[in-house]
């Protein structure tokens, strides 16, 4: 919310009277993910956002007192999660190989806050567990499905970034259906429709999944 997070209430009356103040709702994690994918935001950050919708809440929302990620007027913390700070963190994550583990966490903490930094670091740490995209397409029914949820999310985001044909999407959907979590499958479905609508809209495997899982949409 612009009026709260930018502290417009601190403006002097004669200054506030010269501008128009409009309350603007924050994007949901799904809305931010669509923008982030279109703007090449780092994949580990997008994976973290996909699994951490509470980071996109406002302190004005109910029951956010214990939310460790967001801005709160009562907190002295200068770094917190916002759509802007997540985007600002992207170059840091992209250059993660130049940082020590501690330096990376410290840099992220100074950008999105300590709680988010430690949580994002978890997603970065599982990157080496990802199955190659080409290996999935080569044998979608038998290639190993990683058990770790963070790894699965990283993989489906890579697929959303990479898929460009119905044939490859059909193969990857066979792999996605082997994932035990319907939530992960739903993220893949949603991201494909938002970011690759031309191949998702008329894809048989995607449409069959939507019909079978209409209850969780």
Model-predicted segments: where are they?
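Short, small-residue-biased leader/transition segments that mark boundaries at the very start
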Residues: 1-8
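A short helix-turn-beta junction within AAA+ P-loop NTPase domains corresponding to the substrate/partner-engaging
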Residues: 9-30
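Generic structural signal for alpha-helix starts
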Residues: 12, 38, 42-46, 113, ...
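Compact nucleic-acid interaction/catalytic patches
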Residues: 33
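Conserved AAA+ ATPase small/helical "lid" subdomain
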Residues: 36-109
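Generic structural signal for hydrophobic core residues of well-folded globular domains
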Residues: 89-96, 124, 160, 192
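Accessory nucleic acid-recognition modules appended to NTPase machines
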Residues: 101-168
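Terminal-proximal interaction/regulatory segments of ATP-powered molecular machines
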Residues: 145-217
């Amino acid at each position: 919310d612009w009026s709260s997070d930018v502290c417009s209430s601190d403006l002097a009356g004669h200054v506030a009277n010269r501008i128009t103040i409009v309350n603007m709702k924050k994007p949901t994690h799904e809305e931010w993910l669509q923008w982030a994918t279109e703007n090449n935001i780092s994949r580990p950050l997008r994976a973290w956002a996909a699994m951490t919708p509470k980071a996109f809440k406002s302190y004005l929302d109910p029951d956010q007192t214990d939310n460790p990620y967001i801005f709160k007027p009562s907190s002295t913390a200068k770094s917190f999660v916002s759509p802007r700070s997540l985007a600002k963190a992207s170059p840091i994550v992209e250059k993660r190989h130049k940082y020590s583990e501690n330096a990376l966490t410290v840099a992220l903490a100074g950008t999105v806050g300590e709680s988010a930094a430690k949580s994002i670091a978890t997603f970065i740490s599982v990157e080496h567990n990802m199955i190659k995209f080409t290996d999935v397409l080569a044998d979608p029914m038998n290639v190993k499905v990683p058990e770790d949820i963070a790894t699965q999310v990283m993989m489906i985001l890579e697929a959303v970034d990479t898929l460009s044909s119905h044939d490859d999407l059909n193969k990857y959907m066979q792999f996605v259906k082997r994932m035990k979590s319907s939530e992960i499958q739903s993220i893949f479905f949603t991201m494909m429709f938002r970011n690759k609508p031309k191949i998702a809209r008329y894809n048989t495997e995607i449409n069959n999944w939507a019909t079978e899982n209409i209850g969780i949409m």
